[in-house]
Amino acid sequence: MSNDTYTVVSTMKNESPYILDWVAHYKALGFDHILVCTNDCTDPTVDMLLRLQELGFVTHHPTIVRKAGIHRSALRQASRRYDIVMDATWVFVCDVDEYLNVHMGDGSVRALVQGSGKDTDVISVPWRVFGPDGVDKLIDKPVTQQFTKGEFEWDEKERPTTGKFVKSIYTNQDKFQRMGLHAPVSLEEHVGTTKRVLPGGADYVVDGKRTDNPPLFTHAQVNHYALRSMESFLIKRARGRANHSSHVLGMEYWDRFNLNDEKDTSIDRYKSATEKLVKELKADKMLGELHKKAVAWHKRKAGAMKMDPEMDELTVPLLQSVKA
């Protein structure tokens, strides 16, 4: 296991205020490489990633968007052009609002792999959605510290769809035809032989079909901060969804992810390590200034959207929701 390498692959558009905390988190987990694909950014995202690349923390890829769409184009290019992906022992695909949170061993990505059984090809980690919990303003603070209430765990009768969506870390890349947002797609000849498990090793998919094993948060979860604050959500709406480019985000999306059922601060196990690295990153004069510009850009953008009368149909019910 000592020679194994771990790579994160992500796609971003206008996510600059969140980059440093997110990068620090995945470094704290023990990932060796981070590849970030971007497209059409108008905020400091690309400048920050290029500086992080100069400092040796990430690799930046400018996505050439093809007919397959933004996400699929990015992942296809990532998987074919970069040794840090092609030669990686394990690859994890996630977005900047998703934080892997391992409850096994020392909390590292290696502990997740070691604790999920031998001969495993894919470990599918369930989402745990964290809501805005009444936060309306965008502030310069890690999302993991701002938003600490998430959805209840899976229950067969009360919450049968909790954990339905997963993010996967996988190995043995020759078994798969391509990366996927939630899981890699197996080659037809390997569908029946690909071992897909949940964290801890329980079978997740057998012969291409989901098992009845519940997607619990016992061993690991992916904290999913889909909304963040109300102001952050407005910017997300303006940016659009990379994987569903024709969808306009509104109250239906907000209500779906506005889940603040119970407090969960388990991700704090990484707090000291991430804070230390973020402090080091901000000490770099160029990166520190870019981060400040990023926060200011997003605050201005959110303020302008809130002042736009054409947005009242959304901003009014959003404010009512966060203040409820």
What are these regions (language model features)?
Residues 44-93, 101-104:
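Active-site-proximal specificity loops/subdomain of glycosyltransferases
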Residues 73, 102-322:
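Catalytic-site signature of metal-activated, phosphate-bearing donor transferases
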Residues 32-40, 61-65:
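Short beta-strand/loop segment that forms part of the nucleotide-sugar
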Residues 10, 37-45:
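Ser/Thr-glycine-rich phosphate-binding loops at phosphate-binding pockets of nucleotides
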Residues 32, 89, 121:
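Short acidic/polar active-site loop segments enriched in Thr and Asp
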Residues 1-24:
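N-proximal low-complexity "stem/linker" segments adjacent to membrane-targeting elements
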Residues 39, 95-96:
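Short acidic donor-binding/metal-coordinating loop in glycosyltransferase active sites
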Residues 24-32:
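Short, acidic, metal-binding catalytic loop of nucleotide-sugar glycosyltransferases
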